[in-house]
Amino acid sequence: MIRVAINGYGRIGRSILRALYESGKRQQIQIVAINELAKPEAICHLTQYDTTHGRFKHTVKLNGDQLLIGDDSILLLNQPDANLLPWAELDIDIVYEATGSLIDRQACEAHIHAGAKQVLISHPSSADVDETIVYGVNHDLLRAEHTVISNASCTTNCIVPVIDVLDKHFEVKSGAITTIHSAMNDQQVIDAYHDDLRRTRAAGQSIIPVDTKLARGIERILPHMKDKFEAISVRVPTINVTAIDLSVTLEKKVNIEQINSVLQRASNGSFNGILGYTDEPLVSCDFNHDPRSSIVDGTQTRVSAGHLVKLLLWCDNEWGFANRMLDTSLAMIQAKLDR
């Protein structure tokens, strides 16, 4: 049994906990503690009730500093300094670092100094971590000695498996990406101040361009793709599910049927459970609560002049990513067992 703690109990932190209870992995992973600065009453309430993912199927209660989920008891902590967290006392194997504020090795090593054995970051990190993992593509790089690991981003997890499949079959020469991302909690409900002037504007009223480092994230996972991709991102007035418009130029000449066939086979084969494929006329809300990293919409595949391919990919940017956090943490422990 892996003993884990969640540091930061926001959208991803809560999704990790809920995903664990729905995924069938509770015999392998135990959430021992949650460190969150919000009030315990709010933590309990938002665990039970969620606008995006619905009501939690398990009963959630508070008992002092314990969050009770069914027969499970999880210690609630309220410690802003990661160096002072009781990870040694609690014998924590892995900390899910989900605050969004600890993004480099030095900051995350506070958890190691506090007694945790490993840290898995739930967002892109600086380059000095031991590895950045997209589960299903490069989790075989995990080693027993690794202590600080990034699980990349939801969009990196969405797009990299598709690029990997296309490259192995048809050789990707270059690509351009537009991420059509649901609104996030770093945006405003109504106009308010923000360092990013575009994010001063009401999230529910505009399509808002934001900066993205997705292209650099692809390079970190697939180093041979360096300088081959560029990306832009816009936020749209939906609360969950993201679409990615991917255009790639391929070395080999292809048609729509070949592209869709290769991706569909991958979804049923080596990427089963990670990559999906659909040819139904679906919309974004149909992918809410989907545990896969990426779903190819085969109805939107286009090929121009035999080499330029356009794809539409879907992902639940919360739920799919939370499930990959669970998968990667199990792979981290397996790497130790394989030592």
Curated annotation (Swiss-Prot):
Positions that bind substrate: 153-155, 199, 212-213, 235
Indicate the residues that form the catalytic site. Answer: 154 (nucleophile)
Organism domain of life: Bacteria
Q: Which reaction does it catalyse?
A: D-erythrose 4-phosphate + NAD(+) + H2O = 4-phospho-D-erythronate + NADH + 2 H(+)
Please state the pathway this protein functions in, per its UniProt record.
Answer: Cofactor biosynthesis; pyridoxine 5'-phosphate biosynthesis; pyridoxine 5'-phosphate from D-erythrose 4-phosphate: step 1/5
Which PROSITE patterns does its entry note?
Answer: GAPDH
Concerning CDD domains, the annotation shows: GAPDH_C_E4PDH (cd23937), GAPDH_N_E4PDH (cd17892)
Residues annotated as site: Activates thiol group during catalysis: 181
Q: Which UniProt keywords apply?
A: Cytoplasm, NAD, Oxidoreductase, Pyridoxine biosynthesis
Q: What is its main location?
A: cytoplasm
Coiled coil location: none
Q: Where does NAD(+) bind?
A: 11-12, 317
What is an annotated GO biological process for this record, any one? pyridoxine biosynthetic process
A Pfam family per the record = Gp_dh_N
Q: Which residues cross the membrane?
A: none
Q: Which HAMAP family does the entry link to?
A: E4P_dehydrog
The entry's family comment says: Belongs to the glyceraldehyde-3-phosphate dehydrogenase family. Epd subfamily.
Its quaternary organisation is: Homotetramer.
Name this polypeptide is given: D-erythrose-4-phosphate dehydrogenase
